[in-house]
Amino acid sequence: MSYVIDRRLNGKNKSTVNRQRFLQRYRGHIKKAVEEAVGRRSITDMEHGEQISIPGRDIDEPVLHHGRGGRQTIVHPGNKEFVAGERIPRPQGGGGGQGAGQASNSGEGMDDFVFQITQEEFLDFMFEDLELPNLVKRHLTGTDTFKTVRAGIANEGNPSRINIVRTLRSAHARRIALSGSSRAQLRALKAELERLRLEEPHNFGDIKAAEEEIERLKARINRVPFLDTFDLKYNLLVKHPNPSSKAVMFCLMDVSGSMTQSTKDIAKRFFILLYLFLKRNYDKIDVVFIRHHTSAKEVDEEEFFYSRETGGTIVSSALKMMQEIMAERYPANEWNIYAAQASDGDNWNDDSPLCRDILINQIMPFVQYFTYVEITPREHQALWYEYNQVAEAFSDAFAQQQLVSAADIYPVFRELFQRRMTS
């Protein structure tokens, strides 16, 4: 009996490596399709991946072949029409094959290649090259600290960490698997030899044949090594980093009466995308939700996205609450502080200069990055022009963008959180 042992470390997902190589090769096509999908469907609709279509011409492999034209000597087996030395006129048309008619100078020769990417792969491409700007370590004495913890068994490792019990158990199982049938035959032959010696002591031929077969089986069993490199098992120790870069994101959303339902929906979709990005890319991050109209209120995630409360507009109330929470819970020497604000720009006239002063004097000196998105198809409001002064004073830590429609959310989001090149 033959045995096939699959020693591949990726046995259950045999095509994973090839799939990753394929995704890397056609990264441009996939990123374009993901960007189109984000603009087409709801931000909350992330329970599935996306169908990707790649034109057939882009998946062709380069090959070497004879060019058209020239003189060729070809042997056609079973040819009954021509004899050696006859000249055959060149076929008309520029296309290959045996189709009738002239070759066409347009059209495609292959169907598009369509495949499905998973939700995990979809989100990977969606948030590729994005990060929180200016993230630094806070409250540290030096380098990162790590904690070594047990993480199971590995097939490779340091000889000093070999797990003897698991190694011998694996070796024993392998020897049983490889020599099981031979051992069964050996037991049967020994019983047969014992019977021959008792019942047929003069049957020297069968006794000798049984003894030779027993020796052959013993030699076959002995050829199975006691220990194989595949049997070696090691205690796996991994280093878990202790959190050293603590970050908090303040989400400030205007829910005043001037915000139409469409404008509120765009603001919510922007914050849903931001929240999804933070939770996927950062393990240790706090998110503070603040809704405001004439007064500000810290709320939980559910109320932030689904509450229907509304009122007048005093933007400074949200900034004041953010500053109070920063002072109370998030000291700047220990935390990386970020903020994202969404509004339609309408504000009580005397309040916009106050917002500028609060930002410049009480918030911006202590935050890593502050983003403001104004959701309006009209001209910018007074708040935008006051924030221009903040952008001039803190050009590296303050950014503002305009959203006109839901289609602008993803491009603006990528622009705000694009990974920056560091020298």
Swiss-Prot record:
Residue segments, region Disordered: 84-109
Database matches in SUPFAM superfamilies: vWA-like
Domain of life: Bacteria
Alphabetized Pfam families for the sequence: DUF444 (PF04285)
InterPro entries xref list: UPF0229, vWFA_dom_sf
HAMAP family in alphabetical order: UPF0229
NCBIfam families linked to this entry: PRK05325.1-2, PRK05325.1-3
Family from the record: Belongs to the UPF0229 family.
Protein name: UPF0229 protein PST_0721
